[in-house]
Amino acid sequence: FANADMVGHTGSFEAAVKAVEVLDACVKKIVDTVLAVDGQILLTADHGNADEMLDAAGNVVTAHSTNPVPLVHISSVPVKFTKESGKLADIAPTLLYLMQLPIPPEMTGDCLMK
């Protein structure tokens, strides 16, 4: 789903809004399908872009933002996040935990839930 990122590089706010609306509709289809088969989803991103289209002076920003990105767990099974924030290296151990698979000691990230 690169559309919000790619459109964010253009600096066009209107195009970014449309891209996010399309992305939202696509994600809804995936979520509905996964939940229908009792699956789980971890939804996140590696960086922002369309979330910060202008700087404080009103100039167009076309670079990736350094804002924190959400990590959303979607499932019929409740889980508890054990940290308020994390890093990209934490996503793989968290996925393995959800899949009930062992987390290799070589992984440097932490599981973000219990």
Named regions from a protein language model:
Residues 1-114:
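Feature captures the catalytic ectodomains and active-site-proximal regions of enzymes
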